[in-house]
Curated annotation (Swiss-Prot):
Transmembrane segments: 3-23, 57-77
Organism: Ipomoea purpurea (Common morning glory)
Protein name: ATP synthase subunit c, chloroplastic
UniProt miscellaneous comment: In plastids the F-type ATPase is also known as CF(1)CF(0).
Top-level taxon of the source organism: Eukaryota
Keyword flag NAD: no
Origin organism lineage: Eukaryota, Viridiplantae, Streptophyta, Embryophyta, Tracheophyta
Membrane topology: Multi-pass membrane protein
Cellular component terms per the entry's GO annotation: chloroplast thylakoid membrane; proton-transporting ATP synthase complex; proton-transporting two-sector ATPase complex, proton-transporting domain
Major location (coarse): plastid
GO MF annotation list: lipid binding; proton-transporting ATP synthase activity, rotational mechanism
Amino acid sequence: MDPLISAASVIAAGLAVGLASIGPGVGQGTAAGQAVEGIARQPEAEGKIRGTLLLSLAFMEALTIYGLVVALALLFANPFV
């Protein structure tokens, strides 16, 4: 295996995980903050808000998992070799 390809794959894997985590991290923080604010304003809607929050957090976390899958593919099943 060419050392340049190996080094580029490791760097790309790190960038894939890092960049794939930024957006969902910001989104999850914003969503949780807005959910807490919504529950504070309207406590009787707490169950509905919490259910919607958990579903949306799962969808956001899926984006990070996709980045991890790409990184693992670059590290262990390198298509450039």
